[in-house]
Amino acid sequence: MMFQGSKNVGKGEHFSLLEAAGGRGGNDINGTTDWDRTNYFEQLPSNQLELALWLEADRMGTLLQAMDQTKLDNQREVVKNERRRSYDNQPYGTWISKLQGALFPDGHPYHHDVIGSMADLSAASLTDVENFFKTYYAPNNAVLVVAGDIDVPAAKALVRKHFAGIPRGPRVPPLANTSVPANIGREQRIVVVDSQAPAPAVYVGYRVPSRKDRRAPAVVLLGDIMGTGRSSRLYDALVRRQQVATSANGINFGLADGGDMLVFIATGKPGSNADSLEKALLAELAGASSFTQAELDRARAAERFQFVNGLQTTGGFGGRADRLAEGWTFFRDPGHVNKVLGEFDRVTLNDLNALARERLVPTNRAVLVFIPAKQAPSRTSSTRMP
């Protein structure tokens, strides 16, 4: 809806005006939504700063004046098609939603995936959208970052010129209680017969400290050691030595409130046995302890490179503007960007081992197994659903 036009900008003109001024699509002009924030961004020559500010201010202040049922219905179908394409009709496409549902209780903001269910998308009314926009897309709930080749006093004057007249929105309602126990209490098991899957795959998710927790850097480094790159423990064991998987990796989501998810994934070879793959993955995770200084140093160096490399760009994901916005959004500190590397440097082997012993345990995990439909009969009879 944010690109469908506002009072002074027609449908599609946001992109066309920025592209005519030197911006490009993709990482230069886009919008994203994840569990904890929605962000919109553009990157273009510095002499076009006022154009970008005018466009953003116009849709923040006047989007509802151009919104109607036809636009809502159109965008509803766009999102439904995105769900079909990226989730429902993709091999293993439902893995995130299934692990979220297992690792976070019903009623928690992280219990559901970001894109929403088909039922929720169908039920969203024009009034729902208008009320949501009035509540959350207002100056008192927004972070505006201008970065790059700018004159700071002049940039601030332009911001005041275009945004000062937009009134505050209503008080943003506080989040429901997001606190959860450190441990989910028992192993959750889910087996999915997947008609799209070419091979079995096993996903093991753990509830871990959130990105706001002081242990968050240790979570990232633990995930790196176990599951990032060909030097990781999982790749070395499952792909290189045992040769039971074609890929093995880990993902840390960086969720902000209450808890986070650390997920390890192994994909088998076509025709291979899902039980053997699961057994091998769980065995490696059970041995996630006694990390070495070399492993810690390697993971820390990789994170340092990725972080510093991202800061070489002004826009895009992980660029300077993005990091400044993250700092204020999650920590109320735009200077947080200058603290990240120090936080990684302070993680010790004891921190990693303690975190693994506390969180990478059977009673704190959800095991999700995807079985290709043609292999299902031999397995489904013994499946225990949560």
Regions found by a protein language model. Give the residues of each.
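Short, polar/flexible loop-turn hinges at active-site or ligand-entry regions and domain interfaces
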Residues: Q4-V9, G61-T70, S290-F291
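Non-catalytic beta-strand/loop surface segments
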Residues: V9-Q48, D73, S86-N141, G165-D213, ...
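Short, conserved charged micro-motifs
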Residues: L49-L51, V152-K156, R214, G271-S276
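Short amphipathic alpha-helices in soluble, non-transmembrane regions
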Residues: W54-R59, A157-F163, L277-E284
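Extended amphipathic alpha-helical segments enriched in small hydrophobics
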Residues: M261-Q293
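C-terminal, helix-dominated tail/subdomain
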Residues: A325-T329, H336
